[in-house]
Amino acid sequence: FCLSRGLGDVYKRQIIYTSGSTGTPKGVEISHGNMAAECMDALQYMPRAIDIPDRRLLLFLPLSHVFARFMATVAFAGTLTLGLTSNMKTIIKDFEDFGPTLLLAVPRVFEKVYNAASQRAGTGFAGRMFARGVRVAREWSKAKQSGNGIPAGLRMRHAFYDAVVYKKIRTVFGRNADFAITGGAPMDSDLAHFYNGIGMPLLEGYGMTETSGPVCVSLPENNHIGTIGQPLCG
């Protein structure tokens, strides 16, 4: 729409400030053309996330963040249903009520969920079950990523822990979520293998305020832990 109306790179859409992690925050001018091109690239590169029916995202990044602005815009370009929340104290209930199909969060959010699950399991029998389940999830993920197949014994142990441990952790994110996109900080590989092993792949990406959003992102069908995926078109 922006490009068809001739708005393009001439007309400024917004000014978004950088985080200031490398110095004084800078105001970045982003044009209608910048954001329109970014959205079109995302629709072509990652349709499973934003351009098939019944996709839902609960956005809890602040709208002062360029990625939140990008997702709010691309929702209109695709078929993504977008929910907004700002209260982290109610986020678990919000996940349950809204039922997102994908998640978008910095690595710290997934660390907190893992730590909370570990603390809740405690140090008794439940704690030992959780610890064993964690080991099996990581082994399963690494075996799958190796491309050499998953041994039968590991598949059986994984199926057992999926029923008694992993399913409960997945429900924290709602009933429909099948993968998550994360960035903004390095993701610990052990944590990434754990989530991949329980059936919630964390797709790492990279972007900057100056690029209007994402530059690279991993895909669900081609997710190599420890990488940020392929660059978007353009």
Model-based region annotation:
Residues 154-156, 175-182, 187-234:
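Conserved ATP-binding loop and adjacent catalytic segment of the adenylate-forming AMP-binding
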Residues 36-166, 176:
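Conserved AMP-binding/adenylation subdomain of ANL enzymes
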Residues 33, 108, 185-186:
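Alpha-helix/helix-capping structural signal
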Residues 12, 18-21, 57, 62, ...:
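Conserved S/T- and glycine-rich ATP-binding loop of Class I adenylate-forming
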Residues 13-39:
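Conserved AMP-binding A3 loop
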Residues 1-11:
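Single conserved hydrophobic/aromatic residue that forms the stacking wall/gate
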Residues 6, 78, 98, 198-201:
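Short, structured coil segments at secondary-structure junctions
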